[in-house]
Curated annotation (Swiss-Prot):
GO terms for cellular component: extracellular region. Its main location: secreted. Residues 27-50 form a propeptide. It holds the Pfam family Pilosulin. This is M-myrmeciitoxin-Mb1a. The modification Glutamine amide is found at Q73.
Length: 74
């Protein structure tokens, strides 16, 4: 029972990490009347500390809830 709770917790952490991952936006910058030579620029704005804080807060709440339920059953 404890192993399944641990696996569930890890699965939820992975899902939260994927869902709240920062989006990267790629833009192609070129003049409409340009020659065959083009210019492309990829811009990404991400704050890794914000993701870590969000995931860690959610993980703490989840682990507390799971531990309380496991302790009540055991």
């Amino acid at each position: 029972m404890k192993l399944s709770c641990l696996l569930l917790t890890l699965a939820i952490i992975v899902v939260l990490t994927i869902v709240h991952a920062p989006n990267v936006e790629a833009k192609a910058l070129a003049d409409p009347e340009s020659d065959a030579v083009g210019f492309a620029d990829a811009v990404g704005e991400a704050d890794p500390n914000a993701i870590i804080g969000l995931v860690s807060k959610g993980t703490c709440v989840l682990v507390k809830t799971v531990c309380k339920k496991v302790l009540k059953q055991g």
